[in-house]
């Protein structure tokens, strides 16, 4: 038998056999690192051979406040030796100070025959966290020092079930998580430079015959230990030393045993005044009180501020000016000394979600988003820091979507052109697409603006007349405005010969099969009007032509084509009809890559128009349905979740259009993939979103076991090289574009999205995690900071 350490009373005594020596050393280092137990108060005792514990050594066990027994295979074998077992039964008593740690063995009912108090011992395993080891020792020491009231859970002596005992131990463990929960400090705020008496009320009884001390441990200076005076058996008083401002931890020692810990705060006079003013001038509470919002409600304040800002914004909004304004000359403006430098920072700090969504549509939104406060935080990180993770996600996705729109438009327009003016002009045409499709889907302006060009009977200045009508004009002006809107809406929904949105279908229905319908009779001479009919087009050959094009040519063929108008279904367009209608739509000289994307309001109008054509609804009912839909959209737009859904819909639509553009010119069922490198050492990055807690799938292929007869005679390097240079093809489904595909499967791989460079400048590969030791769990973040350097040793082998 071997004992290491100094003689006297010990806080922790570790009983182990030779096969658990590494675990004994690990526990000693762990306890010393926490500063709760001093070095000369830890003792280790190794049980050797089949020798019983002597009477002198039994006194060592009796004077120890807690005993940890490492149950390894070698130690358990000694239980079958009667002299050793009898000495252990005397040494491991009383049961409240014994902690058993299963180290390579499992629990069973046979141990109850060896020790009658087996189920009263605290139980630990090799895969527990270090905090569990510390808490078990602190609990045993507290009970041994007379602090019986640390936990109110009574020990049930008659329980013989393993599961019932584990449940009781879990309850005790939860009730004694921290000794700091059982302390009351008055006062807990101390003025610097002022002599202050601090009173500490304990929940456990203190011994008046033992010296009690309080140790103050500031971060930037050495610890100060002060002798405390015992006011009664539960209360002590101590003169606080003069320390600098900040939070100072303190520990209470009864003799050499730490019986509690807590913290106090030192502050200067100015810091105290600042704290009082900050509590009294809370901006949210102040505004709730000013606007008479009782009880205080963030949601009500958010709604009120959002509506107030909307009233001061023009009806058509400010999104026509874009949100991409950035400061390029003076970059120092991106760093401010204020905590909340902009209104966007303020709304993100206090979780004003609707106000944040509205501010993101105002000019300069990206510039405000790029400004860091004095702590280096941006609006999105401020929102997450204060617990508004959904708001953080919305801000990130909104900024990324705006960047996707800008990048995609520029990529479309700058193909083969160097004129930046073309891009600048085009940017103004699609700058409000984000607003129309995400935050304001039911706006009147974009609907009536789109209808004004499609209604043949409308005058040229109809939309201008509608916008120029003001509320401060006489009542007749409002009536005229309402009449104009209703008239346009009715003519649009009547469809028939006009068929506004489906321009290609309207040509075929309005003018029929007569190719010269658009030619006026009195305009041209008679001989031109009586010309012979146009020859019938030749029918297409029914016999399929042999496809002599090479396979590789199909894959790499690039067809320069513009996206088609999404309002016109491909199956309804007559390719032989080339004559334009009399009143043609005004065509812009600038190509708009998003011109065919329908907003929610346009899709609703098209749906109602189709129902009117089919006779399901009449025009009056369709008008009522549309107005009801607009009212419902206006109410729903006040919901933050509704805005999130619309933003996601727009992002999916843009992604589908980008994917379709990439696949244009290629065969519909062929796609070039990245060469596959066959290597077991390939490092991969799990496919996991920034807001998700786990990867979507395992990127590493399952290991293939080698079997007899499975060896290859080829060279490994040549096989890998040939496989890495070979391209694979796979079948893919065609992806439809446009926002009208609400019922489509919008599952787009997150890895295929091009993330905006604004929220994250670079994607960094995560550092490789250390190898997990066999049968030893990973050490999580719950480990104390000062314990990170200690790793548990491997578990001893099981006994046979």
Swiss-Prot record:
* Database matches in InterPro entries: B-cell_PI3K-Signaling_Adptrs, DBB_domain, PIK3AP1_TIR, TIR_dom, Toll_tir_struct_dom_sf
Compartments, record wording: Cytoplasm; Cell membrane
| Phosphotyrosine modifications at | 266, 423, 448, 463
Q: Does the keyword Disulfide bond apply?
A: no
Q: Where is the composition biased (Polar residues)?
A: 749-759
Q: Which UniProt keywords apply?
A: Cell membrane, Coiled coil, Cytoplasm, Membrane, Phosphoprotein
MF-aspect GO terms:
phosphatidylinositol 3-kinase regulatory subunit binding; signaling receptor binding
Q: What is the effect of changing residue 463 to F?
A: Fails to bind PIK3R1 in a BCR-signaling dependent manner
Q: Which parts of the sequence are annotated with region: Necessary and sufficient to mediate inhibition of NF-kappa-B downstream of activated TLRs?
A: 10-144
Its protein name is Phosphoinositide 3-kinase adapter protein 1
Coding gene?
Answer: PIK3AP1
């Amino acid at each position: 038998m071997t004992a290491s350490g100094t003689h006297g009373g010990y806080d922790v005594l570790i009983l182990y056999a030779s096969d658990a020596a590494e675990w004994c050393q690990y526990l000693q280092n762990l306890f010393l690192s926490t500063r709760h137990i001093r070095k000369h108060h830890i003792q280790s005792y190794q049980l050797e051979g089949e020798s019983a514990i002597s009477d002198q050594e039994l006194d060592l066990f009796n004077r120890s406040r807690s005993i940890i027994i490492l149950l390894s295979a070698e130690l358990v074998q000694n239980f079958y030796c009667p002299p050793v077992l009898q000495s252990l039964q005397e040494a491991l008593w009383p049961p409240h100070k014994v902690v058993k740690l299963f180290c390579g063995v499992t629990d069973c009912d046979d141990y109850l025959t060896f020790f009658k108090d087996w189920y009263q011992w605290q139980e630990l395993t090799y895969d527990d966290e270090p905090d569990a080891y510390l808490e078990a020792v602190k609990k045993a020491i507290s009970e041994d020092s007379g602090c019986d009231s640390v936990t109110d859970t009574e020990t049930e002596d008659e329980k013989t079930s393993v599961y019932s005992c584990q449940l009781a131990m879990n309850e005790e463990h939860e009730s004694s998580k921290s000794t700091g929960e059982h302390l009351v400090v008055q006062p807990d705020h101390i003025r610097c430079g002022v002599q202050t008496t601090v009173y500490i009320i304990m929940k456990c009884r203190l011994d008046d015959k033992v010296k009690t001390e309080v140790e103050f441990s500031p971060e930037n200076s050495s610890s100060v230990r002060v002798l405390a005076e015992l006011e009664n058996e539960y209360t002590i008083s101590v003169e606080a030393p003069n320390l600098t401002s900040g939070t100072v931890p303190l520990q209470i020692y009864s003799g050499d045993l730490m019986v509690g810990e807590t913290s106090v705060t030192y502050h200067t006079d100015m810091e105290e005044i600042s704290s009082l003013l900050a509590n009294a001038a809370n901006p949210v509470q102040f505004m709730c009180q000013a606007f008479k919002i009782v009880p205080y409600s963030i949601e009500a304040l958010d709604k009120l501020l959002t509506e107030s800002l909307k009233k001061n914004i023009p009806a058509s909004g400010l999104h026509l000016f874009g949100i991409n304004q950035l400061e390029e000359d003076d970059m120092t403006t991106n760093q401010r000394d204020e905590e909340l430098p902009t209104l966007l920072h303020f709304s993100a700090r206090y979780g004003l979600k609707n106000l944040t969504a509205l501010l993101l549509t105002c000019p300069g939104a990206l510039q405000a988003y790029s400004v860091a406060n004095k702590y280096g935080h941006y609006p999105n990180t401020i929102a997450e820091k204060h617990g508004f993770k959904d708001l953080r996600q919305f801000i990130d996705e909104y900024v990324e979507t705006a960047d996707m729109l800008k990048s995609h438009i520029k990529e479309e327009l700058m193909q083969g052109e160097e004129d930046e003016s073309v891009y600048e002009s085009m940017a103004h045409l699609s700058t409000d697409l984000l607003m129309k499709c995400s935050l304001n889907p039911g706006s009147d302006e974009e609907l009536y603006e789109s209808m004004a060009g499609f209604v043949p009977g409308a005058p040229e200045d109809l939309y201008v007349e509608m916008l120029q009508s003001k509320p401060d004009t006489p009542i007749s002006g409002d009536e005229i405005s309402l009449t104009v809107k209703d008239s346009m809406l009715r003519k649009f929904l009547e469809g028939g010969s006009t068929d506004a949105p489906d321009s290609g279908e309207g040509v075929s229905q309005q003018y029929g099969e007569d190719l010269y319908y658009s030619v006026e009779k009195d305009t041209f001479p008679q001989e031109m009007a009586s010309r012979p009919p146009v020859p019938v087009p030749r029918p297409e050959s029914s016999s399929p032509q042999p496809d002599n094009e090479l396979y590789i040519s199909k894959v790499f063929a690039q067809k320069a084509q513009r996206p088609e108008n999404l309002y016109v279904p491909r199956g309804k367009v007559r390719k032989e009809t080339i004559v334009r209608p009399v009143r043609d739509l005004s065509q812009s000289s600038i190509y708009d890559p998003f011109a065919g994307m329908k907003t929610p309001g346009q899709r609703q109008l098209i749906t109602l128009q189709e129902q009117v054509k089919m006779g399901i609804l009449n025009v009056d009912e369709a008008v009522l349905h549309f107005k009801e839909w607009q009212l419902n959209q206006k109410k729903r737009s006040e919901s933050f979740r509704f805005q999130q859904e619309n933003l996601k819909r727009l992002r999916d639509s843009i992604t589908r259009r980008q994917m379709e553009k990439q696949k244009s010119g290629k065969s519909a069922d062929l796609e070039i993939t990245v060469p596959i490198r066959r290597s077991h050492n390939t490092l991969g990055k799990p496919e996991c979103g920034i807001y998700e807690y786990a990867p979507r799938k395992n990127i590493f292929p399952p290991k293939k076991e080698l079997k007899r007869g499975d060896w290859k005679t080829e060279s490994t390097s040549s096989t890998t090289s040939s496989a890495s240079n070979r391209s694979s093809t796979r079948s893919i489904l065609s992806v439809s574009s446009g926002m009208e595909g609400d019922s489509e499967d919008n599952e787009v791989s997150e890895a295929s999205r091009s993330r905006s460079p604004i929220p994250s400048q670079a994607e960094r590969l995560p550092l490789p995690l250390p190898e997990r030791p066999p049968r030893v769990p990973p050490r999580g973040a719950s480990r104390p900071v000062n314990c990170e350097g200690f790793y548990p040793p491997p578990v001893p082998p099981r006994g046979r």
